[in-house]
């Protein structure tokens, strides 16, 4: 119902409010004839997300029916949580904010606005880690083992484009692409494929043998010569993909080169040795490992962080495969698994297995304080579970 200026002045007089103490613009509110509750939802955005929306970018809600929904921008992932408010929030199109009203005292004016909706809660966003554990599992359904091993059936099932992956993985586009690179996924004709590990090691072996026969430096492997020499053995795109996975591209005047990463090659070789053994005598493993890497490369145990764990309490000392990617994504479940495997950990041993759980401003120390308790043993700080394990 509309109100006249005289009615407003009379209301202020009854309320004993001096009009000079107020802005001269008055909003008269009424419910829209088409008003229904539940038509709108509110979402709280930070400045960065607001600017992205204003620039025309999209925000996407992702998740299956069984998943807790997340919201994704182009480069970040957010948890969606409902926050209740003590006051009712009204949606009023056309309502003027104080900074949109004249600062000087003007004659009393009335703006009639309709309430389009209301809510007593809103969606609150909290930055979270993308949920990527499912990604490798999906790609492992149909690994790539070279062109000669591709069958019609492998081309018809379990194949994923970028859009296919974004429809089932709770991650922003940039975070997904970064993880695809980290797990050495290869885009073959628009389809993302994981190379069979034995095939990947075969490619790497071709490259390192060529480097040895040509007496090249690992820090300067010429791309074009490498492709020409190995094209009779494997597709050029596979050779270049392997160089990209295990090296860094350098732009040179004479053509692109790759500087191979010693740590990555030593790490892959260790995985090849450990993947079929339950436990390995540490001394014997280190000897075989060093013999298995290309001449001129040096193996070190710190290259195996997040890949393998050394047991120094056993006699003889042993090493076994334990990959971070095989552990639960949930923080509490991760700690339960680790403490179920080993009762007490040093920070150096456990850090590689919880590093990825840290938020933007969270440290490993803060995580350990929350989920573990510390004690001293022979001058060494050890961590064990803060809660009883079932």
Curated annotation (Swiss-Prot):
Its main location: nucleus. This is Sister chromatid cohesion protein DCC1. Keywords: Cell cycle, DNA replication, DNA-binding, Nucleus. Belongs to the DCC1 family. One of its GO terms (molecular function) is DNA binding. Component of the ctf18-RFC complex which consists of ctf18, ctf8, dscc1 and the RFC complex. The gene is dscc1. It is found in: Nucleus.
């Amino acid at each position: 119902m509309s109100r006249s200026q005289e009615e407003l002045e009379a209301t202020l007089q009854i309320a004993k409010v001096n009009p000079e103490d107020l802005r001269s613009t008055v909003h008269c509110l009424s419910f829209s004839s088409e008003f229904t509750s539940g038509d709108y939802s509110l979402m709280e955005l930070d400045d960065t997300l607001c600017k992205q929306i204003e620039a025309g970018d999209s925000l996407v809600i992702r998740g299956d029916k069984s998943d807790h929904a997340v919201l994704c921008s182009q480069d970040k992932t957010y948890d969606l949580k409902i926050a209740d408010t003590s006051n009712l929030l009204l949606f009023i199109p056309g309502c003027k904010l104080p900074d949109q009203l004249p600062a000087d005292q003007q004659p009393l004016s009335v703006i009639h606005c309709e309430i389009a909706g209301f809510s007593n809660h809103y969606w609150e966003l909290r930055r979270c880690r993308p949920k990527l554990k499912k990604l490798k599992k999906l790609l492992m359904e149909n690994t790539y083992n070279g062109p000669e091993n591709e069958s019609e059936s492998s081309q018809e099932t379990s194949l994923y484009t970028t859009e296919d992956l974004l429809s089932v993985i709770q991650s922003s586009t940039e975070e997904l692409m970064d993880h695809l690179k980290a797990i050495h996924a290869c885009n073959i004709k628009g389809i993302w494929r994981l190379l069979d590990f034995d095939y990947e090691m075969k490619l790497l072996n071709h490259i390192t043998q060529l480097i040895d026969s040509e007496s090249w430096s690992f820090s300067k492997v010429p791309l074009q010569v490498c492709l020409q020499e190995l094209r009779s053995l494997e597709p050029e795109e596979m050779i270049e993909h392997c160089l990209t996975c295990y090296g860094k591209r350098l732009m040179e005047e004479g053509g692109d080169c790759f500087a191979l990463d010693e740590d990555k090659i030593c790490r892959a070789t260790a995985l090849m040795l450990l993947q079929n053994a339950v436990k390995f005598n540490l001394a014997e493993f280190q000897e075989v490992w060093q013999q298995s890497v290309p001449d001129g490369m040096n193996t070190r145990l710190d290259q195996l962080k997040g890949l393998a764990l050394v047991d120094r309490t056993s006699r003889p000392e042993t090493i076994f495969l334990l990959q971070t990617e095989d552990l639960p994504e949930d923080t509490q479940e991760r700690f339960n698994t680790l403490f179920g495997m080993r009762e007490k950990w040093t920070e150096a041993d456990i850090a590689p297995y919880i590093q990825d759980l840290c938020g933007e401003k969270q440290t490993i120390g803060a995580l350990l304080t929350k989920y573990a308790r510390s004690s001293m043993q022979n001058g060494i700080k050890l961590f064990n579970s803060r809660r009883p394990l079932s």
